[in-house]
From Swiss-Prot:
The gene is fabZ. It catalyses: a (3R)-hydroxyacyl-[ACP] = a (2E)-enoyl-[ACP] + H2O. This is 3-hydroxyacyl-[acyl-carrier-protein] dehydratase FabZ. GO terms for cellular component: cytoplasm; membrane. NCBIfam families: fabZ, PRK00006.1.
Length: 150
């Protein structure tokens, strides 16, 4: 499957997130089980801008990390192009998170995620987000897939 085939309808099938927590608008590049590049159009309409910060809206760093994690989820689930019913993608660790540039409304946030390894049910990713080709955030992410509690 190519990046062009992963449109918003496919993203909604692969990720359980919905507004206001869906933070991936588009897949730009995709190599199954290797890497993914995604896009988030950051708008003033995001609910977190109401309080972060009034008069000086800045995208919270944890939301950038969440956008990277959702991109990692697409990379994992995207290999099969389906998410099993009830499967959820959980963070199990974040290492080396660094925030290097502020993200404002109107910015296009590009998320780049690469698989580092998969061992005993834990995925490890190298991830970074850019705005205008400048790194805004970088981190190593560790995630696992679990069935939701019934």
């Amino acid at each position: 499957m190519t990046a062009a085939e992963i449109d918003i309808r496919q993203i909604l099938k692969l990720l359980p997130h919905r507004y206001p927590m869906l933070l991936v608008d588009r897949v730009l590049e995709f190599e199954p089980q290797k890497r993914i590049k995604t896009l988030k159009n950051v708008t003033i309409n995001e609910p977190f801008f109401q309080g972060h910060f009034p008069g000086q809206p800045v995208m919270p760093g944890v939301m950038i990390l969440e956008a990277l994690a959702q991109s990692a989820g697409l990379l994992t689930f995207g290999a099969d192009m389906e998410r099993k019913e009830g499967a959820l993608y959980y963070f199990v660790g974040i290492d080396g998170a660094r925030f290097k540039q502020v993200v404002y409304p109107g910015d296009q946030l590009h998320m780049n995620v690469t698989v580092e390894r998969y061992i005993r049910g834990i995925w490890k990713f190298k991830a970074f987000a850019t705005v205008d080709e400048k790194v805004a955030c970088e981190a190593e992410l560790m995630c696992t897939v679990k069935q939701a509690d019934a």
